[in-house]
């Protein structure tokens, strides 16, 4: 069966790409250049897609700096640094991009329907939905209803299904799953800062580094500063 995979090039999305392959899917990945601070991730997405040997990798371009509203799309908003995991989960962080997953899933839905795909894979997980409203199980359920009601395939009784295999997993479990699937961690990118070397102090870097450390594993990526 055909599947569209939302691929940022990060740890989570790379894992779901390899999961989709393990599920026997014919994989088509889609990434987004929305002029994010961390556009470096797009290079990783390309490398991961190429290494996985997928059918097609697409990059959609649009500019969310037009209205900002996030530290990832507005340079005037500072990125949080050196926060604890507990501090990260207290409220919705400034790295939340307004309606981003709704935008991404809408593009993925259009792509999936155009190629008659049966599935759309997204890498939302338990750690994400503690802080991000568009990563929660009830959000995914609501978007599944949109997929059913708003497409020709859905109206004909063959809805495109959203698959979120990481929805109940934390970062450590995702890394363990990725190891089983053979995800090339050295090609992935999680850092929110721009640049060629991961900072090691933004929320995303710290979550990733802490998970590898908890498992007693070494993250193959170099960092400017470790945990």
Curated annotation (Swiss-Prot):
Entry's Gene Ontology BP terms: queuosine biosynthetic process
Entry's EC annotation: 6.3.4.20
SUPFAM superfamilies: Adenine nucleotide alpha hydrolases-like
Pfam family, one: QueC
Protein residues bound to ATP: 7-17
Pathway as given in its UniProt record: Purine metabolism; 7-cyano-7-deazaguanine biosynthesis
Superkingdom of origin: Bacteria
An annotated Gene Ontology molecular function: ligase activity, forming carbon-nitrogen bonds
Reactions the enzyme catalyzes: 7-carboxy-7-deazaguanine + NH4(+) + ATP = 7-cyano-7-deazaguanine + ADP + phosphate + H2O + H(+)
InterPro entries: QueC (IPR018317), Rossmann-like_a/b/a_fold (IPR014729)
Keyword match Ligase: yes
Group of enzyme by EC: ligase
Keywords: ATP-binding, Ligase, Metal-binding, Nucleotide-binding, Queuosine biosynthesis, Zinc
Reported cofactor(s): Zn(2+)
Cofactor mode of binding and number, as noted: Binds 1 zinc ion per subunit.
Binding locations of Zn(2+): 191, 199, 202, 205
Family: Belongs to the QueC family.
Known role: Catalyzes the ATP-dependent conversion of 7-carboxy-7-deazaguanine (CDG) to 7-cyano-7-deazaguanine (preQ(0)).
Full protein name: 7-cyano-7-deazaguanine synthase
Source species taxonomy: Bacteria, Bacillati, Cyanobacteriota, Cyanophyceae, Nostocales
